[in-house]
UniProtKB/Swiss-Prot annotation:
One of its GO terms (biological process) is thiamine diphosphate biosynthetic process. The gene is thiM. Catalyzes the phosphorylation of the hydroxyl group of 4-methyl-5-beta-hydroxyethylthiazole (THZ). It is an enzyme of class 2 (transferase). It comes from the Bacteria. Belongs to the Thz kinase family. Pfam families: HK (PF02110). It catalyses: 5-(2-hydroxyethyl)-4-methylthiazole + ATP = 4-methyl-5-(2-phosphooxyethyl)-thiazole + ADP + H(+). Substrate binds at M47, G197. InterPro entries: Hyethyz_kinase, Ribokinase-like. This is Hydroxyethylthiazole kinase. Keywords: ATP-binding, Kinase, Magnesium, Metal-binding, Nucleotide-binding, Thiamine biosynthesis, Transferase. One of its GO terms (molecular function) is hydroxyethylthiazole kinase activity.
Length: 270
């Protein structure tokens, strides 16, 4: 199994033609930007977090994205209910453990969601992935990663072995672990780190690609590749982070097969 420009473009076309409904229980900071990115890609976003309706909403969605960026007890209950319903329906579940390791509550919540239902894809930075291994000691790592992505590969392997989840570790090189393979993608630009919420956007795009793909490892790799390609193209014409946000959406909307073929950078695979 390998990511190629051809299968990545085929997935983009599938998203654009099918417009899969992606149910996001995400944080206040990124709701708008995440929804706009999904729309630009061609998917259909919905942001619903009330426990009274999440199961019903999952019932019509093609993927569920759970993001713990802004937590409250009612949201945690809604996340668990939605995840159980998604598992019952057999649709992809993407978990973004934002800031896991920063506080005990955040780390426990991420671990409880992992235990409640094994997510299809877990996407986080290296510190967040490593936090799953320190859940007993509650080592504080912070919201932004203090680790290189390659430092979490072994932890990602263990998560994959234990829960069957594809693990996507974002960083300068994105590592995707699953299907008895490790894929490495090296697209993107340093300016992307100056825009809040692009990691959360990547998780949402994982949901869109998982909705049209039978291989969730490939779906995560394709999502990270498209995210990185659009980001680096946007950075090339942006003097700062404000304009990058605007150009990112436009380029995601206009992305072509030629863009992917010219820019996709695969640096590891086995």
């Amino acid at each position: 199994m390998q990511i190629t420009p051809e299968n990545t473009w085929a997935a983009v076309k599938a998203i654009r033609s099918r417009a899969p409904l992606i149910h996001n229980i995400t944080n206040y900071v990124v709701m708008n930007s995440t929804a706009n990115a999904l729309l630009a890609l061609g998917a259909s976003p919905v942001m619903a977090h009330a426990q009274e309706e999440v199961e019903e909403m999952v019932g019509i969605a093609q993927a569920l994205v759970v993001n713990i960026g802004t937590l409250s007890p009612s949201w945690v209950r809604a996340m668990a209910s939605a995840a159980l319903k998604a598992a019952d329906r057999g649709i992809p579940i993407i978990l973004d453990p934002v800031g896991a390791g920063a506080t005990a509550y955040r780390t426990r919540t991420a671990f409880q969601l992992l235990e409640t239902v094994s997510p299809t894809i877990i996407r986080g930075n290296a510190s967040e992935i490593l936090a799953f291994e320190s859940v007993e000691t509650m080592e504080t790592r912070g919201v932004d990663s203090t680790e290189l992505s390659q430092n979490a590969v072994d932890a990602g392997r263990r998560l994959n072995d234990s829960y069957g989840s594809t693990v996507c570790i974002s960083g300068e090189t994105d590592f995707i672990i699953g299907d008895r393979a490790i894929l490495g993608i090296r697209n993107g630009h340093p300016l992307m780190t100056r825009v809040t919420g692009l990691g959360c956007t990547a998780s949402a795009l994982c949901g869109a690609f998982a909705a049209v793909n039978s291989s969730f490892t490939l779906a995560a790799a394709q999502a990270m590749a498209v995210m990185g390609i659009a980001g680096e193209m946007a950075a090339e014409i942006s003097p700062g982070p404000g304009s990058l946000q605007l150009h990112f959406l436009d380029i995601l909307y206009r992305l072509t097969e030629e863009d992917i073929a010219r820019r996709l950078r695969i640096v590891a695979g086995e």
